[in-house]
Amino acid sequence: MGRKERDKKKSKKRHYEDEEEEEDDAPGKESQEAVPSAAGKQVEDSGAKLDEYGAKDYRLQMPLKADNASRPLWVAPDGHIFLEAFSPVYKYAQDFLVAIAEPVCRPTHIHEYKLTAYSLYAAVSVGLQTSDITEYLQKLSKTGVPEGIIQFIKLCTVSYGKVKLVLKRNRYFVESTHPDVIQQLLQDHVIKDCRLRNAEGEETELITETFTSKSAISKSSESGFGPSTSQEADVQNKPDVPADLYEFYEQMDKDEEEEEETQTVSFEVKQEMIEELQKRCIHLDYPLLAEYDFRNDSVNPDINIDLKPTAVLRPYQEKSLRKMFGNGRARSGVIVLPCGAGKSLVGVTAACTVRKRCLVLGNSAVSVEQWKAQFKMWSTIDDSQICRFTSDAKDKPIDCSIAISTYSMLGHTTKRSWEAERVMEWLKSREWGLMILDEVHTIPAKMFRRVLTIVQAHCKLELTATLVREDDKIVDLNFLIGPKLYEANWMELQNSGYIAKVQCAEVWCPMSPEFYREYVAIKTKKRILLYTMNPNKFRACQFLIKFHERRNDKIIVFADNVFALKEYAIRLGKPYIYGPTAQGERMQILQNFKHNPKINTIFISKVGDTSFDLPEANVLIQISSHGGSRRQEAQRLGRVLRAKKGMVAEEYNAFFYSLVSQDTQEMAYSTKRQRFLVDQGYSFKVITKLAGMEEEELSFSSKEEQQQLLQKVLQASDLDAEEEVVAGEYGSKSVQMSRRTGTMSSMSGADDAVYMEYHSSRSKASSNKHIHPLLSASGNDVLHVCVL
């Protein structure tokens, strides 16, 4: 066996602890059918020369313009775009780049973006033309845009966004503003079969009509949209700004309040052949954009729902919704906002705008309860119109307008109870106007496909904070849901006071010698337990809890490992929540944490990674985590990101501590986990010594206490060392089969058996008692043999 093969096997073996697992089948034919061939294309960069240091030399391909200092972009031949955040036209350029490219890294002064096939698909879906994209890049770039980039943009946008599947008056139409594209599609025999025919068997005529588009979301006069938060007058007063940039933003992002007339050509298709039509169009590289003309849908009844007068949208929330409803119809797609930035209000506003039956899917029962609370808080919907469908709460769905459930309930494949089966039949039989998908990137792509086949919705809106997955299924989900409609900049929201200003810190905790000796010797999963239960980590956690409780802060401590979670919480006398905790007990602990001044610290396992709404929390301490998962790190930071009352924007008002045992695998994982947040502009402060820790009275101060803890950890089974598996929630590994390595004693069930010998001298009081001759022969020393 070659070295490469051995390394490959080794990497597969260790995959469970290195990256976040997304359980899914190998991508087969069905998986590929949902993704256009152009989606996998990358920018080709073969002409760059490398210097002696390995850096790429682009001077020949990127000649500088004479006024390059006034322009904010560098467009590299490999598809990477660099934006100067200190440019006077930064706001204009940033809005354009968010529309056409994926953010890679956004620190303080220079932002990096990358052109991808999917980002360009998203750009054309919101109305940008190929010529617009290339023209604006040329205007904003300090250099000439490389020819390879121009060709890549043309290749990816030549067919994307040109054809739409529109639902009008409960009839499906394939619509386009390009008559030649419609004619090209109709030449295909499969699409010709999907076309609706009249009673005589003849094809229905092509429909030519003038479509008047007007945004369904009215533009707020106070929100200061247009060029985001920058002032247009200030830009025009700058003498170093080129004249051709003045009208740039107005051209790129037209004011959608003005009515615009567009001539379209369309033909009607058979409803029962929609799925086949979509697959065929993707095969022809003309993916259908789903748009829902909800205003003209007379078949599905309007529901009685409006926003309350107290619900005021923030500028970025309003902008994201204008991207969704920009042409008077509802576009399917993804809105990316940080945790705590008000994603729920965006979802409720979308439901109030469409005013058709709405299905909301979350990833836990707690998420369902919180979505119900959000609808009652922000909208005028009557409580009787909201129906929950979880394992604990199955409301009667009679005449219900808003249904809220979890992915696991809908994707459940085994036998259901009679009551659950009736609710599922009701969900399947309804025609849903809007489906809100909360953090759908946390579930496997295969499960999401199953959910899509069970319930049909005219418009799908995904709300997420982290558009990342550790597997390669991100493209599948992107094309199944729709394009990215809007993505916010975390640092801008923080500087504006919309989310908390967080101090992130990585606290290095030295391993005690006894624990480290065992850590080096043991090769099983118990290593994870050893660095999690490190006494110095426990002391650091206890010190931070005491320090912040004296400041009247509200603290959440996260631990993926249940053994560690219980040990920490019970020893410190704090309440804890994990998978088996009953729903009623969970809600009671959370309510006490929110309102009881005596309960300032709670311990939570990975069940609290998403959908736990705890706006009062302002300190988060992480003692164990899921390998190198970037998404989990961002989701956990989100628990303390909600804006704090009476906050001062210049000062840190929230704290995120990640406790890491030094010289262990945990340090490598920690670096990987921080990648996403560092790319958003956050910086992690490394703390090697906590000031004042020596003066505190903390647990495990003596060697004897540490030795007792070590014995307890060594007596734990391999199962105790594994992370929690949350039953009934996708995104967790299903417990069907597991393979573990261990000793023969462990496999034979003798994990808890410890052989101990110790000698003790008999006291005078006991010397008079009758002793068996076998023991009396040994004199005063008695040998005690104990098997635990």
UniProtKB/Swiss-Prot annotation:
Origin: domain of life = Eukaryota
A Gene Ontology cellular component where this protein is annotated is: transcription preinitiation complex
Subcellular localization: Nucleus
The segment(s) forming the Helicase C-terminal domain are 539-699
Report which reactions are catalysed by this protein: Couples ATP hydrolysis with the unwinding of duplex DNA by translocating in the 3'-5' direction; ATP + H2O = ADP + phosphate + H(+)
- Matches recorded under SMART domains: DEXDc (SM00487), HELICc (SM00490)
Q: Which InterPro entries match?
A: ATP-dep_DNA_Helicase, ERCC3_RAD25_C, Helicase/UvrB_N, Helicase_ATP-bd, Helicase_C-like, P-loop_NTPase, XPB/Ssl2, XPB/Ssl2_N
Q: What class of enzyme is it?
A: isomerase
Q: What is this protein called?
A: General transcription and DNA repair factor IIH helicase/translocase subunit XPB
Q: What residue spans carry the Basic residues bias annotation?
A: 1-14
Q: Which family does it belong to?
A: Belongs to the helicase family. RAD25/XPB subfamily.
Give every Helicase ATP-binding domain span: 324-485
What function does this protein fulfil? ATP-dependent 3'-5' DNA helicase/translocase; binds dsDNA rather than ssDNA, unzipping it in a translocase rather than classical helicase activity. Component of the general transcription and DNA repair factor IIH (TFIIH) core complex. When complexed to CDK-activating kinase (CAK), involved in RNA transcription by RNA polymerase II. The ATPase activity of XPB/ERCC3, but not its helicase activity, is required for DNA opening; it may wrap around the damaged DNA wedging it open, causing localized melting and twisting that allows XPD/ERCC2 helicase to anchor.
| Motif Nuclear localization signal, chain ranges | 3-15
EC identifiers of the protein: 5.6.2.4
> For the region Disordered, what residue ranges are annotated?
1-46
Instruction: Mention one GO biological process in which this protein takes part, according to its record.
Output: transcription by RNA polymerase II
Subunit annotation? Component of the 7-subunit TFIIH core complex composed of XPB/ERCC3, XPD/ERCC2, GTF2H1, GTF2H2, GTF2H3, GTF2H4 and GTF2H5, which is active in NER. The core complex associates with the 3-subunit CDK-activating kinase (CAK) module composed of CCNH/cyclin H, CDK7 and MNAT1 to form the 10-subunit holoenzyme (holo-TFIIH) active in transcription. Interacts with PUF60. Interacts with ATF7IP. Interacts with Epstein-Barr virus EBNA2.
Annotated GO molecular function terms are:
3'-5' DNA helicase activity; ATP binding; ATP hydrolysis activity; DNA binding
Binding positions (ATP): L337, P338, C339, G340, A341, G342, K343, S344
User: Keyword set for this entry?
Assistant: ATP-binding, DNA damage, DNA repair, DNA-binding, Helicase, Hydrolase, Isomerase, Nucleotide-binding, Nucleus, Transcription, Transcription regulation
Position of motif DEVH box? 438-441
Give the residues annotated as coiled coil: none
List the SUPFAM superfamilies.
Answer: P-loop containing nucleoside triphosphate hydrolases (SSF52540)
Which species?
Answer: Gallus gallus (Chicken)
